[in-house]
C-alpha cells in the first residue's frame, strides 16, 4: 500500500499537529518507505540525497516510540543520534524540537567546540533524545560522564560521510557501549561501495533496505538546464553573468576540488561578486562564519566542494550551479536537492565544457530526463557542440581497427603442431611427445 498522507502512518496527534504547523501533509518517498518498518521496530538501512526529507524519516518513528512507551521516571537518553558535523547536529536538534513541540520530550545536543559546563545539564537532567558528534560523545563516555545503557535506538545520519572522515572505529565503540539497544537506523546519501555495506552489516541486524531519489513530481519544482562553455575562461564569464541576474538571490556553486574553491572565489571577487566558501580543511570557526554570512544575507554566493557542503542546511537557495560537473547521478541529485525546498521552486544550472558532455549524458540517463541547453546571446560558444549521439562507446571505425590489430597479433604467434594422439584420453596424464621436453632424471 502506498502511503499518501502522514495520518495514514498512525502517528500521534501531537506529531501530526507539528507537521501541519510546518505545512507538511504528504510524506516524501524516503519517509513513506522508511517510517513504517521503523515504527515496527525493524533496523533500517536508508539511502536518500539531501532535500528528500531524510531527517524526518528517522525522527518521526523515534519520537513516536517515546510517546508509545513513556518511561515512569526520568533517566538517561533513550534515543541517540550521531552526525558527522556540528552544523548537522544543530540542524537535527532544531528539527527534532520543532516536531516535538506539542509533547513533553526533551532534546539535547553534544558537539565539539562547546565548553564542558554547557553540557553539564545533559548529564544531570532528564533527556529523551541526544544528538551528538562522535568525537565529543566518545570523550564523555570514556570519562564516564555519559550513560549509554538506556539507549533503545541508535541512529546514524550521513553515515557515508562519517566513514570518509575516519570515524568508523569511534562509531563502533559507541555502538558497543549501546549494545542493549533494540533498534539501529542508518541513513546515508548513497549505499554504493563495499565500505558502507560492510559497515552496515556490522551494526545492523536483518535491516529493511530503503532507497528513494526525489520523485519526478519533486524534481519538476527544479528547473534544470545547461550552458555550453568553450573553456575555463568562458565558463567563468557565464557564471559571473548568471550570478548577477536579479533572480539569483542565494546561490551555491559546486566544484570538485578544494584548490578550485579558492581560485573561483577569487575570480568572482575580482568580478565584483562578494562570496564565501567552504572547503574540507577549514576550521570550525571559519565554517560557522561562512554559513552565517550566507544565511544572514551579507553575501549571496557560496562556493563549495561536495564533501564540505555535506551536512549543512541553507534555507531559501534559489540557484545551484555545477561549475564542475559531478561524476555520478547520485552526486547531481544531492547537489540540486539544495534548492526547491519546503514547496518552493528552484533552478539548477550546469556549465559544460566539451569534456563534460559524457558526464552530462550520464546524469540525464540517471534522472531519466534530458537536461536542455540554453544560450546567452553575448556569450555564445564559438566551438561546435559534440554530437548528441555521443555515448562514450567506441565508434565502429575504432572497433574495426581494434579487430584488425587483434588479427595481426594472432598471425604473429608461432603455430604449434598438435597431433591427434597427443590430445586423446589415454589414461595417466603425460607430456605430449611433440613438446621437445626431455625426461627428468634423478640423481642418486
UniProtKB/Swiss-Prot annotation:
SUPFAM superfamilies: P-loop containing nucleoside triphosphate hydrolases. Residues 238-387 form the Helicase C-terminal domain. The lineage of its organism: Bacteria, Pseudomonadati, Pseudomonadota, Gammaproteobacteria, Enterobacterales. This is ATP-dependent RNA helicase SrmB. Residues 382-391 have a biased composition (Basic and acidic residues). The keyword ATP-binding applies. A motif (DEAD box) lies at residues 157-160. It comes from Escherichia coli (strain K12). InterPro entries: DEAD/DEAH_box_helicase_dom, DEAD_box_RNA_helicase, DEAD_helicase_SrmB, Helicase_ATP-bd, Helicase_C-like, P-loop_NTPase, RNA-helicase_DEAD-box_CS, RNA_helicase_DEAD_Q_motif.
Amino acid at each position: 500500500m502506498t502511503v499518501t498522507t502522514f495520518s495514514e502512518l498512525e502517528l500521534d496527534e501531537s506529531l501530526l499537529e507539528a507537521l501541519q504547523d510546518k505545512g507538511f501533509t504528504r510524506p516524501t518517498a524516503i519517509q513513506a518507505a522508511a517510517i513504517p518498518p521503523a515504527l515496527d521496530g525493524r533496523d533500517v538501512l536508508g539511502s536518500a540525497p539531501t532535500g528528500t526529507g531524510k531527517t524526518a524519516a528517522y525522527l518521526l518513528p523515534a519520537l513516536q516510540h517515546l510517546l508509545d512507551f513513556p518511561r515512569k521516571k526520568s533517566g538517561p537518553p533513550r534515543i541517540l543520534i550521531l552526525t558527522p558535523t556540528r552544523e548537522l547536529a544543530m540542524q537535527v536538534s532544531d528539527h527534532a524540537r520543532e516536531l516535538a513541540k506539542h509533547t513533553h520530550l526533551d532534546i539535547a545536543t553534544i558537539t565539539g567546540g562547546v565548553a564542558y559546563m554547557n553540557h553539564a545539564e545533559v548529564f544531570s537532567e532528564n533527556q529523551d533524545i541526544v544528538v551528538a558528534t562522535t568525537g565529543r560523545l566518545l570523550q564523555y563516555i570514556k570519562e564516564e560522564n555519559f550513560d549509554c545503557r538506556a539507549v533503545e535506538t541508535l541512529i546514524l545520519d550521513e553515515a557515508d560521510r562519517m566513514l570518509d572522515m575516519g570515524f568508523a572505529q569511534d562509531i563502533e565503540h559507541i555502538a558497543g557501549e549501546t549494545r542493549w539497544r533494540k533498534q539501529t537506523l542508518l541513513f546515508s546519501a548513497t549505499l554504493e561501495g563495499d565500505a558502507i555495506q560492510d559497515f552496515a552489516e556490522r551494526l545492523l541486524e536483518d535491516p529493511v533496505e530503503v532507497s528513494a531519489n526525489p520523485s519526478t513530481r519533486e524534481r519538476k519544482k527544479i528547473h534544470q538546464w545547461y550552458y555550453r562553455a568553450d573553456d575555463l575562461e568562458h565558463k567563468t564569464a557565464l557564471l559571473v553573468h548568471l550570478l548577477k541576474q536579479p533572480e539569483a538571490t542565494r546561490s551555491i556553486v559546486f566544484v570538485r576540488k578544494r584548490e578550485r574553491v579558492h581560485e573561483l572565489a577569487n575570480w568572482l571577487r575580482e568580478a565584483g561578486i562578494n562570496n564565501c566558501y567552504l572547503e574540507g580543511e577549514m576550521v570550525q570557526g571559519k565554517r560557522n562564519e561562512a554559513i552565517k554570512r550566507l544565511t544572514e544575507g551579507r553575501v549571496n554566493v557560496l562556493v563549495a566542494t561536495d564533501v564540505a557542503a555535506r551536512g549543512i542546511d541553507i534555507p531559501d537557495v534559489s540557484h545551484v550551479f555545477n561549475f564542475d560537473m559531478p561524476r555520478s547521478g547520485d552526486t547531481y541529485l544531492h547537489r540540486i536537492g539544495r534548492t526547491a525546498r519546503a514547496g518552493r521552486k528552484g533552478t539548477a544550472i550546469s556549465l559544460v565544457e566539451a569534456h563534460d558532455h559524457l558526464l552530462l549524458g550520464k546524469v540525464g540517463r540517471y534522472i531519466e530526463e534530458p537536461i536542455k541547453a540554453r544560450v546567452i546571446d553575448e556569450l555564445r560558444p564559438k566551438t561546435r557542440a559534440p554530437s548528441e549521439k555521443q555515448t562514450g562507446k567506441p565508434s565502429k571505425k575504432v572497433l574495426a581497427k581494434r579487430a584488425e590489430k587483434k588479427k595481426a597479433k594472432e598471425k604473429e604467434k608461432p603455430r604449434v603442431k598438435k597431433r591427434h594422439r597427443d590430445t586423446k584420453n589415454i589414461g595417466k596424464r603425460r607430456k605430449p611427445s611433440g613438446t621437445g621436453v626431455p625426461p627428468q632424471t634423478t640423481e642418486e
